[in-house]
Regions:
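Repeated loop/turn-to-beta-strand initiation elements of outer-membrane beta-barrel proteins
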Residues: 79-85, 107-111, 161-164, 174, ...
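Solvent-exposed loop segments that connect transmembrane elements
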Residues: 125-136, 177-200, 237-266, 301-334, ...
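Residues that define the transmembrane beta-barrel architecture of outer-membrane proteins
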Residues: 32, 63-70, 93-97, 144-150, ...
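Transmembrane beta-strands of outer-membrane beta-barrel pores
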Residues: 42-48, 56, 61, 66, ...
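Residue-level signature of outer-membrane beta-barrel architecture
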Residues: 74-78, 103-105, 156-158, 218-220, ...
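Outer-membrane beta-barrel "beta-signal"
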Residues: 45, 678-679, 707-719
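Outer-membrane beta-barrel initiation region
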Residues: 12-80
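Membrane-embedded beta-strand positions of outer-membrane beta-barrel proteins
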Residues: 38-42, 86, 101, 111-113, ...
């Protein structure tokens, strides 16, 4: 980001005071300390191409000026020993605001309040289909969500009394953002299986949350006790908006067409209460014990609907001439859910020897969840003669909504343990090892009433679940010389999921095993080079991760338990190098390079979609490399110059439109910035910065490409 906050360094002993707090006369030769400052800034960005993509990536508004107070700090005495302070910033056309006001008094406490708001931008573009270059412009090309909170906090800090903190917070999230649940179209030009989900979709977001928190901390001898509680009330009213059969209207297709708009509204009113108690006891300097317990209960009321119409936010019952058979939806959703969770943990830190540290931990969790809901299921059936404008041939009409009820419950117990040991008894060596174990046992029940005429079949699931996780870690740090150190680590992790299914329909996962091995090594070197070349530091790191996934399914309609099959193999190599070079006291150079090779292999890559011979699902690749660098030069005691450059490249795009939507990132990005800072006076500093951005994206067919030029100027005044 080109907007740079002003910074300041506050000395440990303020000017005009000695270390014992007594005032002294400030001489002319002493440097005056400024406790307060304000930084004013103004800037702007000129973009060409996809402005929304630039805004999403760099969180800067495009093609408009912005500015205001970039950073502010003011403090002053209040009464005899109190302190008043204000911190914040405010940028117009950026929707970035933050202010904190605090009053504090030693041996009494404080009160502070604040408000924060910031904006995140989103690009509304959907998918791109390279066959015939099919692309649907989004309903809203540029979207944003404003997030913020207003809060007040009171703290009591009276000696010999518990430290009490009370805080109230109101949070909000409001706006629109893109969704990757894309709509579909068959206007792709393919002769076989032409339908693809590439049509952009978006979400309307309207969420608020009120939080009240209370904490009390008190020390009794060698034991610290913390008690606290938290209450939350959340209100969520969001919606998903997508198209089906986009563009499929006469005369492109035969009447009546198939374009329709779906609005799925999700409503949730939630109340949460949690309480906790934590103790920390220092039995001896070499033996500590901590324990904690928390209880959380959550209740929510849900509502919503899924309505198909000729436009977004349509009312149920409006005529839809383009309605298609089996357009499922629902209305009048109502339901409740309850969650109760208990967590207990205990930890022991033991240092039996000077060079040996042992940490043990235990955690128990009990979780109980129940939910019930009812709704009216909607569906459609093909039109029959006589055909009319409101009952067109080839269209469909809605059926009478059918009531459906569903409920589910989950109950499980989870146990976790950890043992960690560290030993540094050998000179220049540190050895460590750890083991983590987790066991879970539970039961899942799901039921949904049958409504075949609306596309809902009977669902009845009863399964006992179990999980066993193990992770073993070992590592070593070696410091053979002042200018060289090495670190190596290896871990092995397994996770075994086992579902004992008592009742179900169709296909269910009966068991799955994940096995991960990770090895990484880091070398830090500061080679001795000729003094005329300054100093040099190098950090080299290599990381290898290998994961296998073995799965087993049961097909209950055939009463068959399938053989276990390796369903996935994930391999990842990460190579990185960092360099810092200071050839002169006034000059430095930093560079970082990383290369990632990541591939996921599944049996699906051997499946060909008839009549084509291309694989429907290819191995997923996420290979990319990045370069970041920076150069700084101190021109004189009042002026310094900086240049930064970053580069990103991913070449994972695979073009197989005949059988799928081409996925995989194929993008290249360059970012360059240059800044100069000038100390105008002893309390005034000026900053000028220029930035250039260039982004090219193959996956989007170039629709996400952009170039941008940014200018920013900031003036900091200390007082």
């Amino acid at each position: 980001m080109l907007v740079c906050a002003g910074t300041c360094a506050v000395a440990a002993v303020r000017g005009g005071e000695t270390s014992d707090g007594k005032s002294t006369a400030t001489t002319e030769g002493q440097t005056e300390e400024y406790k307060n400052w304000i930084e004013l800034g103004i800037g702007g960005v000129i973009t060409s191409g996809d402005r929304a993509q630039f805004e999403q990536e760099h969180r800067l508004p495009g093609d408009q000026p912005y500015g205001g107070i970039q950073d502010l700090h003011f403090e002053g005495p209040l009464g005899k020993d109190g302190l008043f302070s204000v911190d914040g910033h405010a940028l117009w056309d950026f929707n970035d605001y933050d202010i904190t006001v605090q009053l504090s008094k030693p041996k009494l406490g404080y009160i502070k309040a604040g408000f924060t708001e910031f904006r995140s931008w989103y690009d509304g573009n959907g998918g791109f289909f390279p066959h015939n270059d099919v692309f649907f412009p989004p309903t809203f090309p540029e979207m944003h969500i404003d997030r913020g909170e207003a809060w007040i906090e009171l703290g009591l800090r009276v000696p010999d009394l518990p430290e009490i903190t009370i805080r109230y917070t109101h949070e909000f999230r409001d706006g629109q953002k893109d969704s990757t649940i894309w709509g579909d179209t068959n206007l792709t030009g393919l002769p076989v299986n032409p339908t693809r989900k590439i049509v952009p979709a978006f979400r309307d977001i309207d969420e608020t949350r009120d939080i009240f928190a209370f904490d009390a901390l008190k020390t009794f001898g060698n034991t610290d006790v913390n008690l606290g509680m938290r209450y939350e009330h959340s209100t969520i009213d969001d919606s998903l908006n997508l198209e089906r059969g986009a563009g499929q209207l006469p005369p492109v297709v035969p009447p009546p067409g198939a374009q329709r708009f779906i609005t799925q509204r999700d409503v949730n009113n939630l109340d949460l209460f949690s309480g906790h108690a934590i103790t920390e006891t220092r039995i001896r300097d070499w033996l500590w014990f901590t324990a904690g317990y928390s209880y959380t209960t959550l209740g929510s009321d849900i509502g919503g609907s899924r309505v198909i119409g000729t436009h977004f936010d349509a009312d149920f019952g409006e005529p839809v001439p383009t309605l298609r058979p089996f357009d499922h939806g629902f209305i009048n959703l109502a339901g409740t859910s309850q969650v109760a969770e208990h967590i207990f943990n205990a930890n022991v830190l033991w240092m039996p020897l000077k060079d040996l540290t042992v940490l043990t931990a235990f955690r128990y969790t009990h979780d109980d969840r129940e939910s019930d809901s009812t709704f009216l299921a909607t569906d459609s059936t093909p039109n029959v003669p006589p055909f009319t404008p409101s009952n067109p041939q080839g269209g469909a009409h809605p059926i009478t909504p059918v009531p459906v009820a569903a409920n589910a419950s989950v109950d499980y117990n989870r146990f976790g343990q950890r043992l960690e040991m560290r030993y540094d008894g050998l000179a220049n060596w540190l050895f460590y090892a750890a083991g983590e174990w987790e066991e879970e046992f539970g039961n899942r029940l799901e039921h949904q009433s049958e409504a075949e005429e609306a596309g809902f079949e009977l669902l009845d699931v009863n399964e006992d679940t179990s999980l066993l996780c193990q992770k073993y870690i070992t590592g070593v740090n070696w410091y053979p010389m002042m200018r060289l150190n090495l670190s190596a680590q290896y871990y092995h992790k397994t996770a075994s999921y086992d579902n004992d299914i008592n009742a179900a329909i169709h296909q269910r996962l009966a068991g799955e095993d994940w096995t991960t091995d990770d090895f990484n090594i880091r070398i830090t070197c500061r080679p001795k080079i000729p003094a005329c070349l300054g100093t040099l530091a190098l950090v080299t790191r290599y990381d290898f991760v290998h994961t296998t996934i073995d799965s087993q399914w049961a097909v209950f309609s055939d009463e068959e338990l399938l053989n276990e099959k390796q369903s996935g193999v994930i391999k990842q190599h990460v190579i990185s190098e960092a360099l810092t070079w200071n050839p002169l006291a006034r000059f430095y150079l930093q560079a970082n390079f990383s290369y990632v090779l990541n591939q996921t292999d599944t049996p699906a890559n051997n499946i060909n979609l008839i009549p084509n011979t291309s694989p429907t699902v290819v191995n997923f690749r996420n290979d990319y490399w990045t370069v970041t660098s920076g150069v700084g030069y101190l021109i004189n005691d009042k002026t310094d110059f900086h240049v930064d450059y970053s580069f990103y490249c991913a070449n994972d795009y695979f073009k197989n439109p005949a059988v799928a939507v081409p996925y995989g990132s194929g993008a290249t990005e360059h970012t360059v910035s240059a800044s100069i800072t000038r100390q105008l006076t002893k309390n005034t500093r000026l900053l000028l910065r220029y930035g250039y951005f260039n982004y090219r994206d193959v996956t989007s067919g170039g629709h996400n490409n952009y170039q941008a030029h940014s200018l920013y100027s900031g003036l900091q005044v200390r007082f």
